[in-house]
């Protein structure tokens, strides 16, 4: 488990959680004596019964490369799976074995970076090749420079084992998060309003907001493509707070001064509101009638208004409708 599966965090979900089933699933794991390895800087990032491998933050890819090197050089790789279900392994192998850059990504190389002993890396490589193995990567690993690499490497490692698609094997991202990723729950579609088609196809990865604001017009790579950062003059932010989840907040605070105008919908005087030129006060869930649907539970919950909206606060849909009317594009 890269990044672990924190039992406390798994009880929290946007939109709420009703069943709270993860503890029961963790217990089933322990009852079956399944070996859980928590690879994380924090020991608490895993359910009870897990073994802990403390790792230097941000070095998960190096650790996985060390395992991959052992699998390749000890011929523990599922060659048939790689041949039939993947593309590009031979090019990856040139990098892994050092034929491309002169540096084999062996266990000793990985130990110097990630802090986990070469002996442990070799032992894990043999163990996961001999048993049914599920590799999980927490969502948190993406929130770093080159944050996509652990996910690419974990997928590569799972492909080398050849267990993708087998019961209890393969690869999983975000297991245990938001109340049940990975649990066998049948969801149904949510209630939505009709929406038009966005004529703008450009986008940036969410973790590059500060970089975009600081470097308009510069190039960046994403999923093998070269893109260009736009020159943003106005930000209108609703339904979230970039100062809650963005990395390097001091850098973001300085970058946030670049645009000419910043507008936000918010219900409290938080960091985003304090750094906005215009704040449109919106209601909380206690000030409107609504419907709640949890993302991982098959439930619809009726939400009855408890109090009238405070002051001039309006719900987000009323705000959007009012703006659309002023712009002459109200549906």
Question: What feature does the model see in each segment?
Answer:
Residues 44-48, 100-106, 131-137, 231-233, ...:
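Short acidic (Asp/Glu) and glycine-rich catalytic loops that position anionic groups and cofactors
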Residues 1-39, 61-65, 159-274, 284-291, ...:
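Extended redox/cofactor-interaction regions of prokaryotic respiratory oxidoreductases
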């Amino acid at each position: 488990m890269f990044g672990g599966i924190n039992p406390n965090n798994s009880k929290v979900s946007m939109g709420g959680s009703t069943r709270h089933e993860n503890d029961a699933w963790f217990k089933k794991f322990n009852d079956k004596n399944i070996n859980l390895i928590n690879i994380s800087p924090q020991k608490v990032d895993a359910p009870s019964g897990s073994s802990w491998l403390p790792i230097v933050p941000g070095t998960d890819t190096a650790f996985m490369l060390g395992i991959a090197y052992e699998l390749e050089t000890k011929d523990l790789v599922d060659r048939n799976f790689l041949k039939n279900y993947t593309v590009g392994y031979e090019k990856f192998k040139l990098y892994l074995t050092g034929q491309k850059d002169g540096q084999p990504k062996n266990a000793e190389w990985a130990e110097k970076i990630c802090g986990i002993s070469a002996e442990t890396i070799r032992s894990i490589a043999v163990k996961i090749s001999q048993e049914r193995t599920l590799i999980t990567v927490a969502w948190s690993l993406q929130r770093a420079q080159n944050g996509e690499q652990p996910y690419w490497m974990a997928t590569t490692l799972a492909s080398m084992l050849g267990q993708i698609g087998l019961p209890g094997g393969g690869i999983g991202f975000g297991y245990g998060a938001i109340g049940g990723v990975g649990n066998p729950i049948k969801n149904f579609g949510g209630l939505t309003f009709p929406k038009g088609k966005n004529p703008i196809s450009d986008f940036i990865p969410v973790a590059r907001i500060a970089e975009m604001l600081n470097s308009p017009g510069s190039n960046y790579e994403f999923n093998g493509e070269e893109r260009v950062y736009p020159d943003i003059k106005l930000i209108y932010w609703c339904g979230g707070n970039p100062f809650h989840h963005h990395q390097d907040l001091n850098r973001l605070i300085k970058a946030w001064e670049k645009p000419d105008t910043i507008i936000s919908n918010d219900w409290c005087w938080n960091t985003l509101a304090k750094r906005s030129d215009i704040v449109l006060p919106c209601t909380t869930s206690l000030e409107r009638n609504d419907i709640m649907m949890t993302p991982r539970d098959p439930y619809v919950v009726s939400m009855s208004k408890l109090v009238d909206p405070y002051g001039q606060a309006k719900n987000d849909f009323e705000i959007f409708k009012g703006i659309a009317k002023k712009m002459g594009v109200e549906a």
